Amino acid sequence: MKLIHVFSIFGTAESFFDGQFEYLVNLGYEIVVVSSDSPLVDAFCRRNGVRFVPLCIPRSVSPSAITKAVKALCSLIRTEKADAVFGHTPVGALCAMFAARMCGVKNRVYYRHGVIYTTMRGLKRTIFKTEEKFVASLATSVVNVSHSLSRLAIIDGLNGVEKQYVIGHGTCGGIDAQNIFNPDLIDKVKLLTLKEKNGLTHADVVFGFCGRICNDKGIPELVDAFEFFKGKYPDISAKLLLIGGFDIRDGVSEAKKRQMRNDPDVLVTGNVDKDVIPYYYSLLDVFVFPSHREGFGMCVIEASAMEKPVLDSRAHGCVDAIVEHETGEYVELSARGICKGMEMMLDSSLRQRLGRNGRRRVLNCYDFKVMWPLVGDLYRKILK
């Protein structure tokens, strides 16, 4: 069976499907990956045994760009005689599902990695919510990456319950908790070098975040919470380590950037290579994720796999990623609510217990070895 997976950017394929595609190829599927080109494509294709076709798939709503992409996809689908087309991310999925429907493809699968309208207002919210409904109506199956996202889809009428699925406990296919996100693999000398590079000491209590530095991720609230915390506990040497770069489309205000720059205890790494992400998690005492919306909070389970306790929001896609009082604690999406969670995490025995439980949960629920067979089961169920 020949499957075409359509992505707006190649990074989505590399981040979430590297290894999983190889697993599916070994099950007998032929996979063609479609996205904008990338220098990482050749190595990815060799590792996974897939083919790649470069096409310009728009990331934003542009009628002319979407029309051009749909025409190109229709031509490709007919040439390849695809048995199934998978669409990822809102606009990429719109192009993929529309083209597949026009070509009469029997299996049209929309991977809903998240929804963006929930943090919008007015006409913009209506437009993007309508787009979600339209894409889902074109699909024969919708794979939501979390159970909370599935509940939201039903509440907001995005699609019927009969066509939507979640893989296991959620995510696109889990993480590698054995060979990548594994605290036992951390080189102590390398970790010490990284700690010194970031100006951290053994005396510091390090709160951390990983991801895009933007409003939707709750960065303004997190920075203010850290300021409250330091004011309340001046004798504690606390640091806030933000692992990631500043986002352009949803960037924090200039005033907030100045606040961050003027606080020597707020450390911003900028974009870092994915190979060193486990080392950055290892620098943390507590992982904080005050996001306003997610498909699934992947960095939460990455941090949990590294035995880090988590302060998490209850937003859709976030709420699934921890078990309250067992692997982490929920916090209110406000500066004072996050600060209250930080205070709770001053208990080192609590941090250790939550961290140990977190890794155990990831191994049981989200490791590749657990998730990939479930992906195979889903494909057998939904593909005709």
Regions found by a protein language model. Give the residues of each.
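A conserved mid-protein helix/loop that constitutes part of the nucleotide-sugar donor-binding site
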Residues: E14-G19, V205, F209-F228, K369
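A short, active-site helix/loop in glycosyltransferases that binds the activated sugar's phosphate group
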Residues: P39-L40, A139-F181
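Short, structured helix-loop element that forms part of the nucleotide-activated donor/catalytic region
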Residues: D42-C45, F228, Y233, K239-V268
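Short alpha-helical donor nucleotide-sugar binding micro-motif in glycosyltransferases
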Residues: I77, N271-V272, Y279-L284
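A short, well-ordered alpha-helix in the C-terminal region of glycosyltransferases
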Residues: E196, L350-C365, L374-D377
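Aromatic "clamp/platform" in nucleotide-sugar-dependent glycosyltransferases that forms part
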Residues: H292
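Short hydrophobic beta-strand element within catalytic cores of glycosyltransferases
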Residues: P309-D312
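Conserved acidic donor-binding segment of nucleotide-sugar-dependent glycosyltransferases
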Residues: E324-H325, E329-A335, M344-S349
